[in-house]
Amino acid sequence: MIIDKLAYNSKLRNIAPISKLLFSMSVLVICIWANSFLVSVFTALTMLFLIIFIGKTSYKNVFHLMTVPIVFIIMGAAAIAISIGQNSGDMLFSLHFGNTYFGVSHTSLLSAVRVMIKCFGAVSCMYFLSLTTPMVDLFTLLRKSIIPNFIIEIAELIYRYIFVLFDVSHRIHTAQDARLGYSNLRVSYHSTAQLASNLLIRSFNQAEKTYTAMESRGYDGEINVIMPKINHSVKFNVFAVIYVVITTAIAIFSRKAGI
């Protein structure tokens, strides 16, 4: 739940969720549509600037969270960079196995770098939203949409109990580890099976307790919550419009220039 904690502590937390959602999604669409190195770098740097310097989120936490998608981005880019052919004509370097060559060409390397930078830009947009807007605010926003309430309520409960069950599984694993439950492969399999079965039983017990608690508080089929006060920041809205216009202009210029 570190992302939610950082979102609650962000200086941008009280800005209207709809403003931040539209802003981040607009920039995300532009970043993907532009397919431009310049736009992607501009988006990534400015989004990180907003998160760290305006939102006052610790850069250590931000970069730690960024390592999660970075691994998948690099793996995907590596797959794009590797070319397979019958000769090593335009490859910068290659390895051959029989009559097949595996290597990296100038074109494939450029494509890989472009995709990687574009992914960084897109991920930074999503992190801007997630690190400045708690899930509670997003669920509140969804309640005002055309999505049926029961779907939103199920999503809220699932989101909440993912972390509850994760905490329970961590405690069980710690207790097992303290009793040498993972000392060798055979014992590890046995301990993992016990952890899974105990977690399943506790999940059912927790669900029953939760439903009983909700009924005792007058649950009638709908979860009623107090809507938080929404701050429609004129400054942020003006900034968002200007930013989107500038990003669009850069995208159009870069597409024409082929950057």
What is the role of each PLM region?
Residues 51-57, 132-133, 252-253:
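Structural signal for the C-terminal ends of transmembrane alpha-helices
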Residues 20, 58-71, 240:
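Alpha-helical transmembrane segments and their helix-start/interface "positive-inside/aromatic belt" motifs
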Residues 36-44, 61-64:
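Short, aromatic-rich membrane-interface segments at the entry and exit
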Residues 37-38, 58-59, 147-150:
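Membrane-helix interface segments
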Residues 66-179:
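Juxtamembrane/interface alpha-helical elements of multi-pass membrane proteins
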Residues 43-50, 137-141:
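Hydrophobic transmembrane alpha-helix segments characteristic of membrane transport
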Residues 1-37, 46-50, 165-259:
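Transmembrane alpha-helix interface motif
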Residues 47-56, 71-75:
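Alpha-helical transmembrane segments and their membrane-interface exit regions
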